[in-house]
Amino acid sequence: MHATEACLAAFEATRDERFLDRATLLADHIVQRQTAQTDGLMIWEHYRADRSIDWGYNRHNSSNIFRPWGYQPGHFTQWAKLLLILERDRPLPWLLRRA
């Protein structure tokens, strides 16, 4: 998410299409490929090295606010914002639907 945000900021500053390409690729991999593991419903926070969801990561450690079990609801809002920013400069059909 933060890498996508950085790429979008770099594109805004430079208008270099490479940054927009990277932001698009990152967004596609997270909000389409990775969410396919949850039937397209959610972006999970923690993954294993093989990119499969780690459903149990920190499940029994509720005190760790920086690496919580499950997902952070605010990250859904952040992804929606980033997808809408991306759609402004690269109107791909999946962006609005996924936002």
Question: Residues of each region from the PLM?
Answer:
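Glycan-recognition and catalytic cores of secretory/periplasmic carbohydrate-active enzymes
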Residues: M1-A99
